[in-house]
């Protein structure tokens, strides 16, 4: 049995396929986390904004991508969306996992932002800070601290 394993994996150099698969898996995971974080933050900002159109777009994005199984999303991305472009399979997988991760990160970040007491925003505004200054200097640092355990 051991000799069969050695003949198959070592002599046949199939271990190289396993190492290549490991490298691809790590690349997909790393890129998906980066893409998901950026998309999640952007869509979370859209969800907490006062703009109804942006809110609706973010709501549709999160509802659709969180509601469709990931394997189905991979097939839709590869065979429907990116089929005419002929993109590399690895790139399509990175994008599919990234968009899926972004939908979940959106809700994590949104809950962290909305979990900050409204008094914090009022305090920043009363100090003369603009809405964006209040958000980035007061609310966001507290929200990051609140979402880190869930995000990691």
Predicted feature locations:
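Transmembrane alpha-helices and adjacent helix-loop boundaries
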Residues: 1-152
